[in-house]
A protein has these predicted regions:
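Short, charged, surface-exposed hinge/linker loops at domain edges
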Residues: 1-12, 45-89
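Short secondary-structure boundary micro-motifs
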Residues: 9-10, 17-20, 40-42
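Structural detector for hydrophobic anchor residues on beta-strands
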Residues: 11, 23, 33-35
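Short aromatic-glycine-(Arg/Gly/Cys) micro-motifs in beta-strand/loop hairpins
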Residues: 15-30
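A short, exposed loop/beta-hairpin motif centered on an aromatic-Gly-Thr core
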Residues: 31-42
Length: 89
């Protein structure tokens, strides 16, 4: 599920070439996730790493993670998760 979230978030990546020739990119749904690089590929690779680190920090500090394309990876209380998976038919 985490890999799918990262892939979905990366489809929202926006980037531009700066005046100095480097590339700058962000993932708008994930506030604070940005990177730059000498090439688009280098920037995208760094951007993905920053997104992964941002998720770790968000989990560690119980910061709500935005739902992206239906992917909700926020931790749920055990009782709520149990109720969702064991609903009466």
């Amino acid at each position: 599920m985490l890999i799918e979230y990262i892939q979905a978030a990366m489809t929202h990546a926006e980037f531009e070439q700066m005046e100095n020739g480097r590339y700058f990119g962000t993932v708008p749904p994930c506030q604070g996730v940005w990177a730059d690089g000498e090439t688009v590929d280098a920037m995208r690779e760094t951007l993905r790493e920053v997104l992964e680190d941002w998720l770790i920090v968000s989990f560690r500090h119980s910061i709500e993670i935005p739902v992206v394309d239906g992917w909700d990876i926020n931790p749920k209380p055990v009782a709520e998760e149990y109720a969702e998976t064991h609903q009466a038919a």
